[in-house]
Amino acid sequence: MKPSMLSKLDQLAERIVEINALLAREDATANLDQYRKLTREHAELEPVVAQFAAWKQAEEDIATAQELAADPDMKAFAEDELRAARERMESLEGELQRLLLPKDPNDHRNIFVEIRAGTGGDESALFAGDLLRMYTRYAERQRWQVEIVSESPSDLGGYKEVIARLVGEGAYSRLKFESGGHRVQRVPATEAQGRIHTSACTVAVMPEADALADIQINPADLRIDTFRASGAGGQHINKTDSAVRITHLPTGLVVECQDDRSQHRNKDRAMQVLAARLKDRQEREAQAKEASARKSLIGSGDRSDRIRTYNFPQGRVTDHRINLTLYKIDAIMDGDIDELVGALAAEHQAEQLAALGEDA
């Protein structure tokens, strides 16, 4: 093991002893925010320190086996023990390396999923609705909450644009690689000749910003307009100006929200989405600078990248970033995307490990 890695692990082992002492104090819960931070840090460090203890035990087992090997009667047994301990130590070192990879500070956050219809007109809008259902069904499988924050329905069903908020521990860590262009190939319901059409939607997954800590928004930078919410055919039409449009003047970002009958709640939701978009913009700019130095296929965050194709006639879904093709399109459209999510996370981890090797 590299000395730098060993030193880091020693520091973490010392830190968990400190945390245990702090949590054992009688006044540990006097400051609840501090208590939560310590328990979260403890939960993050515990698996690393446990693996490090197992690695040190394997190191001791090697030393013991080497001593035993000096005894002719014990040599065969000692060699078996030595081989097993070395294999165990090598495996644990690889696992420790993975555990020490830098964590994304946004991984635990709730998210906003923004889906926009692109090329393909009505068919693209219908596919936007299908993607929303896919993410909603996935969220339900995770026992997350889903709420529609803003929607712009199309005439034939589906959405020109829709924003959903997904609330659940680790939501961003699971879906952050869904940002990008999603292409669909299928025969539209309106197609009389049975020809396959190609349409596309853009998905943006944004971590929910901490209003106080992450993004400072100057009220002077905002233009807030109120207007009457537009009702769908024959449904309730709001007679008050409850819909809200917020324009962030320095960036030109515009957020509309009209799904609630309360202007106050619509404004709060619009501000949440604006904060998430500003945070997302900042982080993508930072990623772009980093990507100029090191090309990353996964998590480049470029919304113009076509990341996935859904081919209905062939029943397949292909993720172009990792060349993964799955022939279970019906299950995937019903929210069974664990295999895709897991493969993307594994590839990202492999990229991080490769980068660690380059920097070493």
From Swiss-Prot:
The protein's PTM annotation reads: Methylated by PrmC. Methylation increases the termination efficiency of RF1.
The N5-methylglutamine modification is found at: Q235
Task: Tell me the protein's name.
Answer: Peptide chain release factor 1
Q: What does this protein do?
A: Peptide chain release factor 1 directs the termination of translation in response to the peptide chain termination codons UAG and UAA.
Q: Where is the composition biased (Basic and acidic residues)?
A: 283-293
Record flagged with keyword Glycosyltransferase: no
Superkingdom to which the source organism belongs: Bacteria
Question: One GO molecular-function annotation for this sequence?
Answer: translation release factor activity, codon specific
Where is this protein primarily located?
cytoplasm
Q: Name one Pfam family in it.
A: PCRF
- Where, per UniProt, does this protein localize? Cytoplasm
Q: Which InterPro entries match?
A: PCRF, Pep_chain_release_fac_I, Pep_chain_release_fac_I_sf, Prokaryotic/Mito_RF, RF-1
User: What keywords does the record list, in alphabetical order?
Assistant: Cytoplasm, Methylation, Protein biosynthesis
Q: Which SUPFAM superfamilies match?
A: Release factor (SSF75620)
Family of the protein in this entry: Belongs to the prokaryotic/mitochondrial release factor family.
Instruction: Name the GO cellular-component terms.
Output: cytoplasm
Query: Residues annotated as region Disordered?
Result: 283-305
